[in-house]
């Protein structure tokens, strides 16, 4: 393992306006590093338009071409570089030593509470501030009182690991107060101890809703969806690697989905090329090996890996609307990696989509749901009925699902 310096991560702006920014990472390798780097890039509201990836198992070299999402026009490139450097193994530079030495320590969980008057788009505006401050939202409880006020409780972790300081806490509350304006009433931050466990509890999903989200008939990727992702396995071209060729519909987070799935399936990528989009499709070439360092020759292993990849590319997130008593509830399910993390910015994108439709959120929560073979992060939004958007209408419900799905997928 080598000693890294600032040159381990280089960020080169595009030469003209509209050109992608080139992010180069050159550092020691470790299992799942590519997936971790993609996750960080997504957290900053960036889309990966191209990528080249190569590793010999000890050292890796990755080049990302990235562009800001429409909803993230301002990017803190210095902060992105710091985060990428902190993810690289053997970051022994004095500035990053503290970050790297605490990599194995789980981040402290904090509870952010604020009480204010409700308005359309409030939840997204707060989420936007937290995202820009580099907080990760782990759990949420949002409740509206009969007099039109809202109590929001966000369980958050800090990517900068500075929330224990008075300066960071003050900056957070000041930013929120500036956004809430006259709507703001109070803002509190505290370390989330065991006594707050009951507040974090996630109400269980109704069986019918769970069936629709996770059942075998809920999201069928066969049939008409099969042309969205085509995978070809070749064990003849390379003497040491299995070549996996992929052609699929482009979407936000596609390269991340492929890398996280490969990691969870114990498939190691030695070389990968994520080509530019052509007519809405992406072409990828991955030279891969199994955990034993050899080609993937077992037909059953090949079939299982390809089936899992196809599912994650065609249907990485699940979105439905159900009745919850007399009310209407939006459910979004996000697969959780074996590392325990789900796709970033899901809450941000869903609240953005609902704000764009002018739909108020009466209550919201984030929790975990386990199925036979995996764990899911589930987002529940109880939606306010309005004259402008009658949610009893099937057409209106389909419009909500369509807008949320397209925002999540970057379509």
Curated annotation (Swiss-Prot):
At the top level, the lineage of the source is Eukaryota
Which gene carries the instructions for this protein?
Answer: ACR9
Keyword Repeat recorded: yes
- Could you tell me which InterPro entries the record lists for this protein? ACR1-12, ACR2/9/10_N, ACT-like_dom_sf, ACT_ACR9/10_C, ACT_dom
| Functional summary from the UniProt entry | May bind amino acids.
- Where in this chain does the entry annotate a coiled-coil region? none
Q: Which organism is it from?
A: Arabidopsis thaliana (Mouse-ear cress)
Q: SUPFAM superfamilies, per this entry?
A: ACT-like
Q: What is this protein called?
A: ACT domain-containing protein ACR9
* Residue ranges of domain ACT in the record: 22-105, 111-194, 243-322
Q: What's a Pfam family this protein contains?
A: ACT_ACR9_3rd
KW Repeat (keyword) present: yes
Q: Which UniProt keywords apply?
A: Repeat
